[in-house]
Amino acid sequence: VDHGKTSLLDHVRSLGIESRSSVMDREAGGITQHIGATEVPAKILNELCSELLRGKIFDSPGLLFIDTPGHQSFSALRSRGGSLADIAILIVDITEGCKPQTIESMRILKESKTPFVIAANKVDRIHGWSASPGRSMAHSLQDQSKDAMSLFEQKYWKLVGQFAEHGFNIERYDKVKDFTKDIAVVPISAREGEGIQDLVAVVIGLAE
C-alpha cells in the first residue's frame, strides 16, 4: 500500500516553497482517501528541470497533479482518476515490486489509453544506496557504488519481468528510444526528493 505516492506529492507541492507541507502527516494511517489536486505552474517546472530539458521550455500553463488513492479498498476512486488524466504516474516500491492495486491501475490506464510513466520509488532503501536530497537521478546513478548498483539492477529487472507478464514494455527513462513503444521508468526516492526533476521532466516530455 505505502509505495510513496503521498510523499512524492509532498515534494510536488513544495516546489517553489521553502517549508514543505506534509500531506503524509495529515492522513490517517498514511492512506489517501480522496482525490486531491495540486497545480504547478510552468515557471517552476522549467526552473526545476532546466538541466534535464536542455534549453527546451515547457509552453503549457503548468501541470495539474491529481492524487488518487493507492489502497486496494479505493478502486472506484482510482478508476475515476485514471480515466480523466492526460498522463499518469504509476508509483511502485522498487523493493517490493507490483501489488494487486498496481496491476489494477495498469488495467485502468490501458483501457482508458492513458499514457503513463512509472516512478520506481524507495531506491534509498536499497542496501548501500547513497541518497542526496534534491539530486537528479541522472547524477545519483553515476555516484552509486558497484554493490548498490548491482542490487538496483536486480530489483529493476525483476520489475521489468513483472510488467512484461501483463504486456507492458518498460525501460529506464534515460535509455528509452521511442516513448510510444516503451514505458519510461524513473527511479526516485520520494522521501529524499531524489529523482523528482527527472520524473517531472519525463511527464513534461509526454505532455508536450
Model regions: which residues?
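Conserved G1/Walker A P-loop phosphate-binding module
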Residues: V1-T68
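Active-site phosphate-binding and catalytic loops of NTP-dependent enzymes
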Residues: G16-G29, A42-L53, F74-A76, K99, ...
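Short loop/turn elements that form and flank the Walker-type P-loop nucleotide-binding site
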Residues: D2, H34-I35, F58-G62, S83-D86, ...
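Conserved nucleotide-binding/hydrolysis micro-motifs of P-loop NTPases
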Residues: D2, L15, L45, G70-Q72, ...
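Residue-level signature of catalytic and energy-coupling elements of molecular machines
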Residues: V1-D2, L8, I31, D67, ...
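Flexible beta-alpha connector loops of hexameric P-loop NTPases
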Residues: G16-A28, L63-I66, S75, A88-G97, ...
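Canonical P-loop GTPase G-domain recognition
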Residues: D124-E208
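Inter-motif core of Ras-like GTPase G domains
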Residues: S75-E96, R107-V117
